[in-house]
């Protein structure tokens, strides 16, 4: 029986490769979002009263891949945690009291998340490599 999406036969090997390929794409999206967070970790508003960059977080959703459960990036949501506040009355975005809102990005957390995403990506690459090396039935 062929897969309705790609036309290949539905086999455990192809299913494993499909699940892992979807996970690779999801982790790639996750790493892109983390990189954007790190790149904007110091991006403040340019005018008083404006908001700085708000950390983005990926939301994943389960999906069916030939009877197995895979994953897909469902959406990217802004992190609603509060902004950091710093006293800097000379900054163009400082409020009347001299405080500037800073992004709610913690670069240490982002670095840990990046490493976790890299390891998940590598694990899924290994699944694909192992599935490719399996003998077809």
Locations of the language-model features?
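Amphipathic alpha-helical polymerization modules
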Residues: 1-137
């Amino acid at each position: 029986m062929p897969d309705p999406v790609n036309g290949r036969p539905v086999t455990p090997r192809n299913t494993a490769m499909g699940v892992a390929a979807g996970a690779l794409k999801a982790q790639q999206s996750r790493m892109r979002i983390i990189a954007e967070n790190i790149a904007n970790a110091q991006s403040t508003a340019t005018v008083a009263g404006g908001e700085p960059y708000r950390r983005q977080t990926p939301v994943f959703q389960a999906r069916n891949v030939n009877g197995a459960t895979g994953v897909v990036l469902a959406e990217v949501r802004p992190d609603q945690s509060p902004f950091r506040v710093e006293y800097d009355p000379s900054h163009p975005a400082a409020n009347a009291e001299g405080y500037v809102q800073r992004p709610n990005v913690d670069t240490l957390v982002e670095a840990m998340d990046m490493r976790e995403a890299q390891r998940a990506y590598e694990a899924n690459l290994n699944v694909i490599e192992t599935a490719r090396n399996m003998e077809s039935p």
